[in-house]
Amino acid sequence: MGNILRCFKGDDDGGDHYPYYKPTSRPHYQPPHYHGQPAAPPAPPQQQPLGPHGVTPSTVGVAALAHDLLNFESTSMVPDGLSQHVVSSRKAQVKWYQKLLEAYKNTTPPPKTPADAAQLIARALNMIQRADLEITSNYVSPQGILEFYNFPIPSLPSASSNYQPSSLPEGVQFVLNTLPVYDKCIGDGDGFTAYVSTTDPRESANVPLEVHELVIARTQARKCRDYQSADALLSSLDEAGYKIISCSDDEVLARKYRIRMRGIDAPELKMPYGRESRNALVKLIGGKSVKIYVYDLDQFGRYVGDIYCNNLFIQEQMLKNGHAWHFKTYDKRPEFARWEREAKAANRGLWASGNPEKPWDWRRDQRNARQDAIQVY
């Protein structure tokens, strides 16, 4: 998880890697004593209330979270004392820490204050029961994961910011749950190529017979060490819209989907801010699995949809940070217009240039220029 977690790990000598932190006990600090000097007087009694980690909010609450995430990454175990403070099962807690670990890794710089850490937890876990997140008037106990770490209760994100629909919105045809998106498969700020495993129920029933035969033939070729034929069969799979992807020392057959993000239009790569827009999308979804609510198939054979990743609505992030335009011609959602106005008012991203060229105007001019060149020829 980077240097911030390693700094809490200590020496690899087989001892306690985090000697001053115990989830179910309170720490004891021994002041340093140097030879020839009088011992330091006893420390005054701790006046601030101690939380379940035995620390105050202003000391090592953030370090405790970092330690727990490091421990979870190594052992898949959640803190022992957490069950005393939340109502959900241990299985649910494991899912929380998976989300927290991913959110922590993707946060730069990592949280340094209790308030920052509380915001990270709230963003990553905004879909869990509120009673598990904080103290409420209806729940005196359990106290919640924020209280477990002595963190303040932040303002929870609004539903429009980090909400994935629990039922299919009107117009959605189906949902895709992708494998992690390769950075190189992100073409610009509003489109990318994604792969969905054929173990997905929706996909498994629709794999063509010819694809099954190609996979079997490739497996046989590899057994015979005929790697030239195996590579040729991979090319045939790609032409059929499928790909064999290596995942955790295993191979997965996946279907290829070309995706167009609904309701936004990002600068083309050759336009000013084009590469910055693409890089912003890479940071949001690169190397991560995404959920795609598919509405339609466009004239170029791309699946048009809403994109969610780590509970973030990706179009919202692109619009709010000035990485894309609201494509009003094809999407009238008022929140899209509002997010674009917010970015424009704050001069974020592409709006910093004052009057950026619209990508649809740029494409029209490019088409006209090509047409003029053909007529001259």
UniProtKB/Swiss-Prot annotation:
A lipid is attached at residue 7 (S-palmitoyl cysteine). SMART domains: SNc. Its cofactor is Ca(2+). The active site is at residues 260, 268, 302. Residues 27-38 have a biased composition (Low complexity). GO terms for cellular component: plasma membrane. Binds 1 Ca(2+) ion per subunit. It is an enzyme of class 3 (hydrolase). Ca(2+) binds at residues 190, 265. Residues 177-353 form the TNase-like domain. Residues 15-57 are annotated as: Disordered. A lipid is attached at residue 2 (N-myristoyl glycine). Its EC number is 3.1.31.-. It comes from the Eukaryota. Keywords: Calcium, Cell membrane, Endonuclease, Hydrolase, Lipoprotein, Membrane, Metal-binding, Myristate, Nuclease, Palmitate. GO terms for molecular function: endonuclease activity; metal ion binding. Gene3D superfamilies: 2.40.50.90, Cysteine-tRNA ligase, C-terminal anti-codon recognition domain (1.20.120.1910). Belongs to the thermonuclease family. Enzyme that catalyzes the hydrolysis of both DNA and RNA at the 5' position of the phosphodiester bond. This is Probable staphylococcal-like nuclease CAN3. It comes from Oryza sativa subsp. japonica (Rice).
